[in-house]
Amino acid sequence: MRPGGALLALLASLLLLLLLRLLWCPADAPGRARILVEESREATHGTPAALRTLRSPATAVPRATNSTYLNEKSLQLTEKCKNLQYGIESFSNKTKGYSENDYLQIITDIQSCPWKRQAEEYANFRAKLASCCDAVQNFVVSQNNTPVGTNMSYEVESKKEIPIKKNIFHMFPVSQPFVDYPYNQCAVVGNGGILNKSLCGTEIDKSDFVFRCNLPPTTGDVSKDVGSKTNLVTINPSIITLKYGNLKEKKALFLEDIATYGDAFFLLPAFSFRANTGTSFKVYYTLEESKARQKVLFFHPKYLKDLALFWRTKGVTAYRLSTGLMITSVAVELCKNVKLYGFWPFSKTVEDIPVSHHYYDNKLPKHGFHQMPKEYSQILQLHMKGILKLQFSKCEVA
């Protein structure tokens, strides 16, 4: 073979190999790509492509979290709670009578909403109360706000007056006796049967100031649920008449029972009805004669009238405010933080468990005298707005 022929044969062989190579590669590429994908899936354990990003060896591997999901749930809950707040306002303004189950459903919904104190809401509401009523100066009768010679009108029997003579004037403190005002943490303890087995006693007793209503029991087994500390307790004059025989033959029993309240203030509505005056004064003189540690105070009738007008504008139109709402209103003015316990005007819990009216008995109030569900809807609004906090169920025990 000629030298030129050998060179041509070599070139022809190379061209043939190149042609075969080109024909073979396109047919194999899809198969190879499938292998790479399967290998990639194994390496990433099925992670979606959207979460697989190119990165240098120094870049940290990103972690898939549920923070977005949690944020969405939080926004949904916030929106739900806002709607619930508006719903309660509308609910309380309705003239239609709502059933106990309606209220319990609302309370169930409220319990799913996280509570947070709202300083601005609290300040605004407190300012409105101070403007209309001014508990700091006018909550109780004092020598400063009721001088000798005043003709004081009764709260309910407003056409009747009592002249303030020296013998009455000397029963009054010189000024408001709440020297440590404003108190940081206050507990207003109602008497609802919801307190039974609540284990709230320790938490209540840690408060700076504890308000109670109508001489409730605080010793023995109940103390673990209701606490034992008392700074101020109201007394309904009917208790003095019915339970203590108007402090005649049962004076000793009265003095024995009140010893459990330490140096608390006893608050009586001496100037609400004329029938209350003599009984309230009898309590004052009994404590003076026995040199008891407690001091007697009297609700100022004008304060109570102004307070009733304030709540009337919000739909509470009953014959008279309950003691619980009166004291709650006082606490908002005297305290920075207010928590309510034992406020439960219903016959059962949200779990449908029967509840006694009081934690110590099941005696119901006079029909129509107070407007408990209407008042309670107002308190629910204060809770939802972060002005005060309602304890609905058992307390957390450390």
Curated annotation (Swiss-Prot):
List of residues binding substrate: N214, N236, P237, S238, S322, T323, G324
Biological process per Gene Ontology, one example term: protein glycosylation
Alphabetized Gene3D superfamilies for the sequence: Glycosyl transferase family 29
Enzyme active site? H370
A GO term for molecular function? sialyltransferase activity
Pathway stated in the Swiss-Prot or TrEMBL entry:
Protein modification; protein glycosylation
Q: Which residues lie on this side of the membrane: Cytoplasmic?
A: 1-3
Q: Which reaction does it catalyse?
A: a ganglioside GM3 + CMP-N-acetyl-beta-neuraminate = a ganglioside GD3 + CMP + H(+); a ganglioside GM3 (d18:1(4E)) + CMP-N-acetyl-beta-neuraminate = a ganglioside GD3 (d18:1(4E)) + CMP + H(+); a ganglioside GD1a (d18:1(4E)) + CMP-N-acetyl-beta-neuraminate = a ganglioside GT1a (d18:1(4E)) + CMP + H(+); a ganglioside GD1a + CMP-N-acetyl-beta-neuraminate = a ganglioside GT1a + CMP + H(+)
Annotated compartments: Golgi apparatus membrane
Question: Which Pfam families does the record associate with it?
Answer: Glyco_transf_29
- Which key words tag this protein in UniProt? Disulfide bond, Glycoprotein, Glycosyltransferase, Golgi apparatus, Lipid metabolism, Membrane, Signal-anchor, Transferase, Transmembrane, Transmembrane helix
Disulphide-bridged cysteine pairs: C186-C335, C200-C395
Family recorded in the similarity comment: Belongs to the glycosyltransferase 29 family.
Role summary: Alpha-2,8-sialyltransferase that prefers O-glycans to N-glycans or glycolipids as acceptor substrates. The minimal acceptor substrate is the NeuAc-alpha-2,3(6)-Gal sequence at the non-reducing end of their carbohydrate groups.
Protein name, per record = Alpha-2,8-sialyltransferase 8F
- What organism is recorded for this protein? Homo sapiens (Human)
